[in-house]
UniProtKB/Swiss-Prot annotation:
Disulfide partners: none
Species in which this protein is naturally found: Ixodes scapularis (Black-legged tick)
Expression induction: Increases following spirochete infestation and decreases in response to engorgement, events that are temporally linked to B.burgdorferi entry into and egress from the vector.
Subcellular location: Cell membrane
Described purpose of this protein according to its UniProt entry: Serves as a receptor for ospA protein of B.burgdorferi, the Lyme disease agent. Required for spirochetal colonization. Essential for pathogen adherence to the vector.
Subunit comment: Interacts with ospA protein from B.burgdorferi.
A GO-annotated cellular component: plasma membrane
Keywords noted in UniProt: Cell membrane, Glycoprotein, Membrane
Protein name: Tick receptor for ospA
Domain of life: Eukaryota
Length: 161
């Protein structure tokens, strides 16, 4: 009887953790999509000049390559979290990739550059939080199933003896 009560309490705890994870994942995905939209709007407003990649200095091209590598790492890390977060991260990476070759960093106002850096940091933080939440729930599920097995074994042992 005690084992059944413990099992019911664990089921309630796992359901609460799953609901929390869904809420965190959906809010992270919607916030990421919103930030990507804001980043695209800011980029289109603050980039009046359309420059070709040939007119960019070498340092700007290498900065572009570094940003592409950063965006690629972020989107590949988000792939394991969930489909919605992967889509939002892809939108954010696409915004950064399509924004960079159009003008040099000199033509961007300082506030726009710092806003872009803050957006990348917040997207990375949300992806890390979602990943941590998913791992926490996964561990909780493992413990729940182990406890369920032990409770069933204890009930069976008590009934058999």
């Amino acid at each position: 009887m005690v084992a059944m009560e413990a099992m019911a309490a664990m089921e309630v705890m796992v359901a609460a953790m799953a609901a929390t994870a869904d809420t965190v994942a959906s809010s992270a995905a919607s916030a990421t999509a919103t930030e990507a939209t804001v980043a695209m709007d800011t980029a289109s407003l603050s980039l009046p000049l359309q420059l070709s990649p040939r007119s960019l200095p070498q340092s700007s091209l290498s900065a572009t390559a570094a940003t592409v590598a950063t965006d690629t790492v972020v989107s590949s890390a988000d792939t394991e979290v969930s489909d919605t977060e992967d889509s939002a991260a892809t939108v954010s990476a696409t915004a950064s990739l399509s924004m960079l070759p159009q003008s040099s960093p000199r033509s961007l106002p300082q506030s726009s550059l710092s806003a872009t850096a803050a957006t990348v940091d917040s997207v990375t933080d949300m992806a890390d939080t979602a990943m941590d939440t998913k791992q926490f729930i996964s561990k909780g599920n493992e413990h729940f199933f182990a406890a369920s097995y032990l409770c069933a074994w204890a009930d069976q042992s008590a009934a058999g003896s």
